[in-house]
Amino acid sequence: MSRLKDNENFKLLLKILIIFAISRLIMLVMVPVYNGIMGTHRSFLFLMNEWDAKKYAYIINNGYTYPTDTDPQANWAFFPLYALVCMFFKAITGGLINTYVIGMIVSNVCIIIAAFFAVRGIKKQTHIKDGYELLMPVLMFMAPYTFYSASVYTEAMFIMFIVLFFYFLSEKKYILACVMAACSSATRIVGCILVFALVVQLYIDIEGEKISWGCIKDFVVTMFKNPGKIFAVLICPFGAFSYMTFLNFFCGDAWAYKNVQIAWRDDEYFPIVGVLWKACTGQIEPRYTYMGWFCLAILVLYGYMFFRKYYAMSVFGIISLLIPLTSHVMSTCRFTFGTYVVFVGIYDILSRCNKVVRWVITGILVIIEIYLLFLWYNSDSWLM
């Protein structure tokens, strides 16, 4: 026992679990607060699992919708790995535990693992002096939009795989990193974009930060001389390709996950620029105006991260945000905080502030999260 107490990893895990417990206690306390204000008697499980959570619960219980089903919102848009893991635990518990409970346990375990390895990787992945590591779990558990990681949503698992990808990348364990990328692409399609982060980091590890045609040529030659690195690049999108193969046999359309999304929105705007212009100038709903400006702020943050030499992370963040912006700003707040790297950017900024400013900003972020949690309990459309 004394050896365990002296173990640095055990101490770190204990601190993370304390922060985690505080964040979940806030969620529990907000249930009677919400019920008291709104005059309802809803349970924690009911309030935490809105919209897509119900879709995932259906998949866990029944599998994917058959092509002959009349529901226009077929659940093929939801990638399978999270549901498969939940199915596994539901099966080994004999189906005795509520599906939402299983899903929330999986999500919460994933975000704890993510926070642990995020802190472990902080020293290698950032340029901040020691002493601020525990800011990361505070951000990951209590920053705005992090309540999704406690629900039956894929956010927590997706974040976990992204954290592990960058952790192994910093250790130069490229195959392990890309296995994590493959798992992330089986959780959400955006996981495929980690291949760009991999290529950026491989270039830096081989050629340094200098960019020239000679360096690029040397990088390409070096890559083709190293089958292990080529293999690592190729397996990044394996999860997504596996799901597309399944869809091809299941419903005859490998792109069904994309094509079915017209059931949620059929707006058509010019990709990225047109989407942001319409949103930021108030030509669509007010909530989308907010999301448009939110996206611009996040792009500035990623630019800051690139300036601070978080090259691989910032490239992943930028591309992962631009993809949804090809069609709409809907859900971009959730998507952004679900890619993890935004936490690193905020962490970097906070770590450079003096103590008072740092904790004031952190406190404001927690208050915003509590307000958003209330909106979530109220199924507010601003969170769609």
Model-derived regions: residue spans:
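Transmembrane-helix signature of polytopic, membrane-embedded enzymes
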Residues: 97-101, 118-142, 311-315
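Loop-to-helix entry region of an early transmembrane alpha helix in multi-pass inner-membrane enzymes
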Residues: 73-76, 93-116, 285-292
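Transmembrane-helix motifs of polytopic, lipid-linked glycan transferases
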Residues: 105-125, 300-304
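Signature aromatic-anchored transmembrane alpha helix within multi-pass, membrane-resident enzymes
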Residues: 233-237, 352-382
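Membrane-lumen/periplasm interface segments of specific transmembrane helices
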Residues: 23-35, 39, 195-212, 216-316, ...
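Multi-pass, polyprenyl lipid-linked donor-dependent membrane glycosyltransferases
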Residues: 110, 130, 134-169, 183-194, ...
